[in-house]
Amino acid sequence: MQPVNIIGGGLAGSEAAWQLASRQIPVRLFEMRGREKTPAHSTDKLAELVCSNSFRSDDPNSNAVGVLHAEMRKMGSLIMMIADQHRVPAGSALAVDREGFAEAVTNRLQNHPLIEIHRERIDHIPDETTIIASGPLTSDSLANAITELTGRDALSFFDAIAPIVYRDSIDMDIAWFQSRWDKGDGHDYINCPLNKEEYLAFHAALLAGEKGDFHEWEKDTPYFEGCMPIEVMADRGIDTLRFGPMKPVGLDDPRTGRWPYGAVQLRQDNALGTLWNMVGFQTKLKYAEQIRIFRMIPGLEKAEFARLGGMHRNSFIRSPVLLDEYLRLKKQTNIRFAGQITGCEGYIESASIGLLAGIFTAADKLDKKVSSPPVESALGALLGHITKNADPDHYQPMNINFGLFPPISEKHPKKQRKAMMAERARKALDQWISEEAFLKSSILEQ
């Protein structure tokens, strides 16, 4: 059987290789580290953890990340198996001994008889079945090859992430639905008004807020005029924001009948309408500062954030436009993408998309049928966001969170609602595995 090529030996590529080889599919795994260095990595080990040693919450009953952990364990994930073996104390979080973890993943893949590891840089995309899992620091030559394949505007080289707020945490007694000048259907934006005193206090807080540092390899990341950090714009002058992302013109506050002094707009971020993006609020403020300062905005005093803002060097494609529900490139279905280059954010999210890419590719190679995971599961919710549910015109990397799951129809307290979503996800994944003959047999054989 012709081997599957996997480009990139990070978490996604390593997981995809394991899923394929475990189903008796030969793999050629290409990783340039060992021959060439990257600005971020310090070793040539596969699945090296670059920033943190934490896989975040391991609580499967009330945290979306913990639900994803549990699902991956159930699916026979190599990354989760090795993480559990190299766990270090971290309360309810899953943290690992990063050196032991990467060493163990490397040894497991090196010693698998169906996996060949090639220490070389790939400058072009092979014609054979290939999974591209090259990560946020994709080499320039491979990025050029991806651009040639997908189109000039399909690949981004840095992210400019604005915070995302859960819709049900916005105070609609203060905020209101309206598009500027009443364009659109009237429900395209949620608006939060500020009077002069509130605006000046917010502006001062932005300037004084503690900023995060760039990693060494990110220090040359450019600020483009269209996605300047909100605090950098604020530093240009007291009224810069009022003529930019906080422009109030064309917005009538129902409580006063007038335009506010300043306004923050939130735009719907997913098809379910559960997540709303703070328009133009990309930022390098530290996370705790973002929560404190953005809760100064009227209507967001009790805001719960599905994602906080940031700016990083990060290569990722416009997956909702380019990929089908099986992570295949629509225009060339022998090519799949996996990991952070698809626009998922986080170690475990990257590994989970690698897991799915490996399973889907194995099914193709063995001429078997397998459906995509149910949207009620964490795997299905993340996959659905990447491939179809996210706004393709404003696509930015996303962590797993309960805002990606279909909402619970009945009204319940937040804690109970999360527990209900977690339980629903467990049942949905179990049913999916039991009904998919290919999954049922191949997971048992691992």
Curated annotation (Swiss-Prot):
EC number(s) stated in the UniProt entry for this protein:
2.1.1.74
The entry's FAD-binding residues are 8-13
Query: What GO molecular function annotations does the UniProt record carry, in alphabetical order?
Result: flavin adenine dinucleotide binding; tRNA (uracil(54)-C5)-methyltransferase activity, 5,10-methylenetetrahydrofolate-dependent
Q: Can you state which reaction this protein catalyses?
A: uridine(54) in tRNA + (6R)-5,10-methylene-5,6,7,8-tetrahydrofolate + NADH + H(+) = 5-methyluridine(54) in tRNA + (6S)-5,6,7,8-tetrahydrofolate + NAD(+); uridine(54) in tRNA + (6R)-5,10-methylene-5,6,7,8-tetrahydrofolate + NADPH + H(+) = 5-methyluridine(54) in tRNA + (6S)-5,6,7,8-tetrahydrofolate + NADP(+)
Reading the lineage from the top rank, the first entry is Bacteria
In terms of InterPro entries, this protein maps to: FAD/NAD-bd_sf, MnmG-rel, MnmG-rel_CS, MnmG_N, TrmFO
- Which Pfam families does the UniProt entry name for this protein? GIDA (PF01134)
Q: Name one GO cellular component term.
A: cytosol
Q: Which cofactor does it need?
A: FAD
Which compartments is it annotated to reside in?
Cytoplasm
Q: Which GO terms of type biological process are on file?
A: tRNA methylation; tRNA wobble uridine modification
Swiss-Prot/TrEMBL keywords:
Cytoplasm, FAD, Flavoprotein, Methyltransferase, NAD, NADP, Transferase, tRNA processing
Question: Which protein family is named in the record?
Answer: Belongs to the MnmG family. TrmFO subfamily.
Instruction: Read off the PANTHER family from this record.
Output: GLUCOSE INHIBITED DIVISION PROTEIN A, METHYLENETETRAHYDROFOLATE--TRNA-(URACIL-5-)-METHYLTRANSFERASE TRMFO
Q: Which NCBIfam families match?
A: gid_trmFO, PRK05335.1
The role this protein plays is: Catalyzes the folate-dependent formation of 5-methyl-uridine at position 54 (M-5-U54) in all tRNAs.
Can you say what this protein is called? Methylenetetrahydrofolate--tRNA-(uracil-5-)-methyltransferase TrmFO
Q: Which organism is it from?
A: Zymomonas mobilis subsp. mobilis (strain ATCC 31821 / ZM4 / CP4)
Gene name, per UniProt, is: trmFO
